[in-house]
Amino acid sequence: MGVSGVLGAVGLLMVLQAAAVQAAEMAPPYAVPLGSDGVQRATITLESYSYTPNHVIVEAGKPVELTLTSVTTITPHNFIIKELSVEQDVSAGKTVVVKFTPVRTGTFPIYCDKRLWPMPSHRDKGMEGTFEVK
């Protein structure tokens, strides 16, 4: 494959990535249900440069358990809600569980700050969302 073929493939990947990010941004917010044990549980999928769902709503003062599943094969990600002191690395193809109890109400950004220098961070590529505590 020549240089023009490589550039064409890179361009196609960038268009597909932008379409995936746009689709994730249009998804409705997900209100996490309260289990019979009083725990709010949700699964969040970490894709190439997006979270699904990317807008999660929980109740303050009740435990939250998030199952974070990376469906990428090479790229590691993380899940950060800085204002709530939540930061979890997720290796490519792995699943981890994060447990915490939010006490502050508000709307907080979720993002991945991983990057391969000199490329933009995953957040700069659209890997961000919203964590809402009511």
Residue map of PLM features:
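Residues within well-ordered beta-strands of beta-sheet-rich folds
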Residues: E65-T67, K99
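Extracytoplasmic entry segments of secretory-pathway proteins
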Residues: M1-T43, V133
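Short, hydrophobic/aromatic beta-strand segments
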Residues: N54-H55, P76-I81, I110
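Short beta-strand/loop motifs in extracellular/secreted proteins, especially
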Residues: V64, T75-H77, G106
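Beta-strand-rich interaction surfaces with strong enrichment in secreted/lumenal proteins
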Residues: P53-V56, S85-D89, V98-K99
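Extracellular/periplasmic metallocenter environments
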Residues: M26-S36, V90-K134
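Non-cytosolic beta-sheet module surface loops
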Residues: S48, T69-V71, P102
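N-terminal edge beta-strand
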Residues: V32-P63
